[in-house]
Amino acid sequence: MAKKLYIETHGCQMNEYDSSRMVDLLGEHQALEVTARAEDADVILLNTCSIRERAQDRVYSQLGRWRELKLANPEMVIAVGGCVASQEGAAIRDRAPYVDVVFGPQTLHRLPEMIDAARITRLPQVDVSFPEIEKFDHLPEPRVDGPSAYVSVMEGCSKYCTFCVVPYTRGEEVSRPFDDVLTEVTHLAEHGVREVTLLGQNVNGYRGTTHDGRVADLADLIRAVAVVDGIDRIRYTTSHPLEFSDSLIQAHADVPELVKHLHLPVQSGSDRILAAMKRNHTTLEYKSRLRKLRAAVPGISISSDFIVGFPGETEKDFDNTMKLIEDAGFDFSFSFIYSPRPGTPAADLKDDTPEALKKERLAALQHRLNQQGFEISRQMVGSIQRILVTDYSKKDPGELQGRTENNRIVNFRCDNPRLIGQFADVHIDDAQPHSLRGSLLQ
């Protein structure tokens, strides 16, 4: 009987991509098949996120639930990867001594040999080093699961924002070679993928070397991906405003495969807070980039990230953030209360804002963002949207669902499953808080 792998993923799209590659790797090297039940697994793998304190606490809560499984089956291997593993290293075993393997985002390619070593020696295996992009040289061809796929184009971040743990857990920026990325995209397209999302912690900082020694930026990469046969839609995330270049804006204008949607995190609308965060740009510079982009691509949807309650945030700072949200006309966005991360400069700043006030500000900010997002959805009613059909509706098996260019889920009645993986024109009939309803055009 085939051995089973249970994998749980916390956090960002980079982690989702890494988890999919670990499934490919362990399937090829150890013939492990994925199971939906941890109690049936021979190997349990937890891919972790450390971006906020709550995410880190969740790791140890989950490991605690698996302790009984390990006691009942000592042959089971429990492996912890991702950013918490990178940050904590062997210290994970101080709180969870039954963990067998600890590995970082840059050492996931060593996972098969680490699992084997843990089984043979009965000793813990820990490797959270940063061998740059070596892992991509050791991964099998990606398995295809649906019409959309992530492709990692670079690793790490060198911006060192004062609140962010990423440079310490994933290392500094390293770009994959240009042709390696295109090879992966071509493989995906040959196996039915129609939409790719190019990933990086600072993806618009991509600088990949081509086969002839040139250095290509993200705009060059997007143009090359767009001509891969079968790829009809391109997204990318996550961007830093500092490197949102004119060449990238021009790519948005020139490349029809590049969606009319951009996620461009700003974090705050206060120049004082942006300086404390070491974002290295002002709100005026950010808005200038948006104006230039909207002039090049009228109607483009823009979402962002916001941190509420950063140390020292005053009522005026928060009001400036709310004003930026309104001025910029942001679509649905992500927002969180600031969470100090050990080892980051901001963790040493005095934080004297009451928690209740932080929650009040977050609620007000989210309410405003949701209002604006819903208004954009309402404006889409009556329009015809080209959507990529991805699956059956989660609530009604008689319906299919897909996504618009501006990343909205559309549910529509259809009894033709062959439409999954294809593009379809759908008339938008109704806007709901988190999705749209439509009718398939024949």
From Swiss-Prot:
Does this UniProt record's set of keywords contain S-adenosyl-L-methionine?
Answer: yes
Question: Which protein is depicted?
Answer: tRNA-2-methylthio-N(6)-dimethylallyladenosine synthase
What enzyme category does the UniProt record give? Answer: transferase
What does the Swiss-Prot or TrEMBL cofactor note state?
Binds 2 [4Fe-4S] clusters. One cluster is coordinated with 3 cysteines and an exchangeable S-adenosyl-L-methionine.
Q: Which InterPro entries match?
A: Elp3/MiaA/NifB-like_rSAM (IPR006638), Methylthiotransferase (IPR005839), Methylthiotransferase_CS (IPR020612), Methylthiotransferase_N (IPR013848), Methylthiotransferase_N_sf (IPR038135), MiaB_methiolase (IPR006463), rSAM (IPR007197), rSAM_horseshoe (IPR023404)
Q: Where does [4Fe-4S] cluster 1 bind?
A: C12, C49, C83
Q: Report domain TRAM positions.
A: 378-442
Q: Which residues are in the MTTase N-terminal domain?
A: 3-120
EC code: 2.8.4.3
User: What keywords does the record list, in alphabetical order?
Assistant: 4Fe-4S, Cytoplasm, Iron, Iron-sulfur, Metal-binding, S-adenosyl-L-methionine, Transferase, tRNA processing
Give the quaternary structure: Monomer.
Task performed by this protein = Catalyzes the methylthiolation of N6-(dimethylallyl)adenosine (i(6)A), leading to the formation of 2-methylthio-N6-(dimethylallyl)adenosine (ms(2)i(6)A) at position 37 in tRNAs that read codons beginning with uridine.
Q: Where in the cell is it found?
A: Cytoplasm
Q: Which GO terms describe its molecular function?
A: 4 iron, 4 sulfur cluster binding; metal ion binding; N6-isopentenyladenosine methylthiotransferase activity
Q: Which family does it belong to?
A: Belongs to the methylthiotransferase family. MiaB subfamily.
User: What is the first-listed, main subcellular location in coarse terms?
Assistant: cytoplasm
